[in-house]
């Protein structure tokens, strides 16, 4: 469970400063020689779609998986100070989940009605590093596989996520230029996730295999990342852009695409597959108010 939470936290941070943009003329934007940190203003917003966000974990007999998509994930700049931005986050989530503890208990089902009801992220102006984040996710999970099978159980859930980055770091090493190479240093993240439901409390009183609530608190180490930034023409849902393909470990861990014309990412692709862990992310820009 802790390693699955680690993957979720890392993915949230990948998108924590992500914005997706709209180009009304669908024309290719040009990049200057060096592109520095963009300036955001109150009211700037970005919207994007995550076509795929999948996790699978096999460890010590336990098997866990989460297969999601997110539509209209909206990020708004709602506050600024001399040193930071305050972002609001909202969006809808669809997906499937499955858990097998390896000892005979299996729980699985559908995230039927799920949304990020509230979310805030603090971003450092100097480099767009995420300092901390807070999310509240409301869900009605239709549990299809459980100790009471074959009776489906609709369970309302409230999921609260807190993330603090010990030494904030950005996935973009500004200023950018074509052919730039470098290293993003490792850092630590303190994260806690709480899953609550009155139905879980009732079921726990009847069946001890059901947890009363789920709470995970963990310090996650994000490793050092070697990257290369290459200028490319990139086509996404919003249009065509000249962007930097920032790939990590020569693309082995995936890439993020940053377009100076929109002041943010326009695309993210990650696919990690080992014997124990699988992570698959595909996201792209939809629209923005940024100019």
Language-model regions, residue ranges each:
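Acidic, serine/threonine-rich low-complexity disordered tracts
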Residues: 25-178, 186-291
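Positively charged n-region of N-terminal signal peptides that target proteins for export
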Residues: 1-4, 9
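Boundary at the C-terminal end of the N-terminal hydrophobic targeting segment
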Residues: 19-23
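Hydrophobic core
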Residues: 12-17
């Amino acid at each position: 469970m802790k390693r699955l939470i680690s993957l979720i936290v890392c993915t949230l941070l990948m998108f924590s400063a992500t914005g997706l943009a709209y180009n009304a003329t669908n024309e290719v934007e040009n990049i200057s020689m060096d592109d520095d940190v963009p300036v955001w203003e109150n009211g700037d917003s970005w919207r994007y779609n995550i076509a795929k966000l999948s996790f699978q974990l096999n460890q010590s007999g336990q098997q866990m998986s989460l297969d999601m998509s997110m539509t209209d994930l909206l990020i708004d700049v709602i506050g600024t100070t001399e040193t930071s931005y305050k972002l609001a986050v909202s969006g809808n989530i669809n997906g499937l989940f499955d858990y097998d503890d390896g000892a005979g208990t299996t729980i699985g089902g559908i995230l039927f009605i799920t949304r990020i009801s509230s979310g805030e992220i603090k971003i450092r102006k100097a480099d767009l590093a995420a300092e901390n984040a807070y999310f509240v996710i409301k869900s009605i999970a239709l549990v299809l596989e459980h100790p009471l099978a074959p009776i489906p159980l609709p369970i309302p859930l409230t999921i609260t996520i807190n993330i603090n980055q010990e030494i904030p770091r950005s996935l973009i090493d500004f200023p950018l230029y074509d052919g730039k190479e470098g290293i993003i240093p490792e850092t630590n993240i303190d994260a806690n996730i709480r899953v609550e439901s009155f139905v879980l409390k009732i079921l726990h009183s009847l069946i001890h295999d059901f947890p009363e609530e789920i709470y995970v608190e963990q310090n996650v180490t994000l490793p050092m990342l070697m990257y290369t930034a290459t200028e490319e023409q990139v086509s996404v849902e919003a249009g065509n852009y000249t962007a930097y393909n920032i790939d990590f470990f020569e693309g082995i861990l995936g890439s993020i695409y940053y377009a100076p014309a929109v002041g943010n990412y326009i695309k993210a692709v990650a696919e990690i597959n080992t014997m124990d862990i699988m992570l698959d992310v595909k996201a792209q820009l939809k629209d923005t108010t940024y100019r």
